[in-house]
């Protein structure tokens, strides 16, 4: 059986852990993952930001690594992919304004393909209008957008994840273990030791 192929949408100032960890973990279990960014080509990089929880009123932000894209956004055909991954950080703030991004996201939702969104990545789902009747979580500041988009907000600790059908969401990177476990389950992946 051919490896499942996943599409990861990223942009400058995507959260460092939220792109690096899932990208590497999904490759580790044998999936093909194409990381793309509007306006950039394979081999180019996006800047990442490290968001941390240090006791302030919101997360802190520090420069992260450069993340190298391994595919080109232009001409991306969503029909060639089995699932979609939407990391958080600052990138979703502007990616959600790109109609080509929204078209891709709508394809995954309309075809009932698995979607994993983390933190602010859910902002892209709200802009695409695909949360009507769905329950999800995200970074708490995204809750009003989820509700306005017709979604049911699920409040949970930052290290937990939520699954509604084939939609897997989590508040932030501390949820990686549970978020990835749930996403892999939705993808039909079983890991045995």
Please place each PLM-identified region on the residue numbering.
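Short, thiol/selenol-centered motifs that function as redox-active sites or metal-ligating centers
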Residues: 118-121
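Extended, subdomain-level signal for the structured scaffold at the beginning of enzyme domains
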Residues: 1-111, 123-135, 143-193
């Amino acid at each position: 059986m051919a490896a499942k192929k996943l599409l990861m949408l990223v942009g400058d100032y995507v959260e460092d852990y939220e792109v690096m960890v899932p990208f590497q973990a999904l490759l580790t279990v044998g999936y093909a993952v194409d990381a793309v960014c509007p306006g950039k080509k394979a081999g180019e990089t996006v800047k990442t930001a490290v968001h941390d929880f240090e006791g302030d009123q919101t997360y802190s932000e520090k420069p992260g690594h450069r993340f190298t894209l391994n595919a080109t956004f232009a001409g991306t055909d969503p029909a060639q992919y089995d699932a979609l991954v939407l990391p958080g950080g600052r990138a979703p703030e502007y990616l959600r304004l790109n109609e080509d991004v929204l078209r891709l996201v709508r394809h995954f939702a309309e075809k009932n393909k698995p979607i994993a969104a983390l933190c602010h990545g859910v902002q892209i789902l709200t802009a695409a209008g695909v949360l009507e009747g769905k329950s999800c979580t995200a970074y708490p500041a995204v809750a009003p957008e989820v509700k306005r988009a017709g979604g049911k907000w699920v409040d949970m600790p930052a290290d937990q994840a939520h699954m509604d059908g084939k939609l897997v969401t989590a508040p932030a990177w501390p949820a990686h273990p549970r978020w990835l476990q749930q996403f892999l389950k939705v993808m039909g992946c079983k890991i045995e030791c």
